[in-house]
Amino acid sequence: MAKVSSIQKNKSRQKKSQSLHNKRSELKSKIYDKSLSLEQRFPLIIALAQLPRNSSSTRIRNRCELTGRPRGVIRKFGISRNKLRELIGRGLVPGVVKASW
C-alpha cells in the first residue's frame, strides 16, 4: 500500500490539471503559432511558465485504484497487475478468464 500522502498529492494534481487544461492548451496553441512575432509570443510564454507546475498533465502518475501502487498498472482496468491477477483468480472481473491450453 502506497503512502496516503502520495496518493492525495496525485489526486490534487489531477484536479489542478483538469481545471487549468483549457487555459494551458490555449496558451500553448498561441505560443506555437508561427504567424505571431516573438514579441507577441513572449508574454504568453511567461504566462504559461507562471501556471502551477502541478497543472501539467505530465506530472500525473498512473496509480492503482485499489492499492495506490505506482508501477505495473494496467490502463484498461486501472488496477495493478498484482491485484488484477488476484481478482481474475477469484472470478471477480467479468469477461476475463485465466488462459489454459
From Swiss-Prot:
Biological processes per GO annotation? translation
SUPFAM superfamilies found in the cross-reference section: Glucocorticoid receptor-like (DNA-binding domain)
Keyword tags? Ribonucleoprotein, Ribosomal protein, RNA-binding, rRNA-binding
Top-rank taxon of the source lineage equals Bacteria
| PROSITE patterns recorded | RIBOSOMAL_S14
Compositionally biased intervals (Basic residues): 10-22
What Gene Ontology terms describe what this protein does at the molecular function level?
A: rRNA binding; structural constituent of ribosome
Q: Which residues does the annotated region (Disordered) include?
A: 1-26
A Pfam family annotated for this chain is: Ribosomal_S14
> How is this protein annotated for GO cellular component?
cytoplasm; small ribosomal subunit
Reported function: Binds 16S rRNA, required for the assembly of 30S particles and may also be responsible for determining the conformation of the 16S rRNA at the A site.
Q: Which family does it belong to?
A: Belongs to the universal ribosomal protein uS14 family.
How it assembles, according to the record, is: Part of the 30S ribosomal subunit. Contacts proteins S3 and S10.
- Which PANTHER family does the UniProt record give? 30S RIBOSOMAL PROTEIN S14 (PTHR19836), SMALL RIBOSOMAL SUBUNIT PROTEIN US14M (PTHR19836:SF19)
Q: What's the protein called, per UniProt?
A: Small ribosomal subunit protein uS14
Q: Provide the species name.
A: Rickettsia prowazekii (strain Madrid E)
